[in-house]
A protein has these predicted regions:
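N-terminal auxiliary segments of SAM/dcSAM-dependent transferases
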Residues: 2-77
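SAM-dependent Rossmann-like transferase core, predominantly class I methyltransferases
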Residues: 62-129
Length: 129
């Protein structure tokens, strides 16, 4: 007998519940939504627009286990966004931080029209380079 599929809402709720011990409820729900959208191969707005649609994401259970063990979402997904671009990340590669994105935006604004010489030390994911 085939196993019934979950709705997007139920999948997000179940994953968020597993993460609530590690994160506050709002953060747990945000992580759950991002993971569900990623593994369903849809955008976050698409996930939210039709929460009663069935979700076909067999990898989500394994992702849930990794997330519940405290592994960062970016490592579980294998990617992280920086300045609207996706960069591959895995254990051993630093995850691009929002603060670094803000710093890079500040430098770009301040140095516009000039030819600065910059040095990126400890590159990590290479998103600044």
């Amino acid at each position: 007998m085939p196993v019934p599929m979950l709705t997007r809402r139920k999948a997000v709720g179940m994953l968020a519940e597993r993460l609530t011990g590690l994160y506050d409820p709002c953060e747990a729900r945000s992580i759950a939504r991002q993971a569900a959208a990623f593994y369903a191969g849809i955008t976050l707005p698409a996930l939210l627009a039709d929460p009663e649609a069935e979700i076909d994401a067999p990898e989500l259970e394994q992702a849930a286990e990794r997330l519940a063990a405290g592994e960062p979402l970016q490592y579980v997904l294998g990617e992280s966004e920086f300045f609207g671009r996706r960069f591959a990340v895995r254990k051993g590669v630093l995850i691009p931080r929002p603060e670094t994105e803000e710093l890079a935006a500040l430098v770009v604004r301040r140095e516009r029209g000039r030819a600065p010489r910059l040095l990126d030390i400890g590159t990590g994911s290479g998103c600044l380079a």
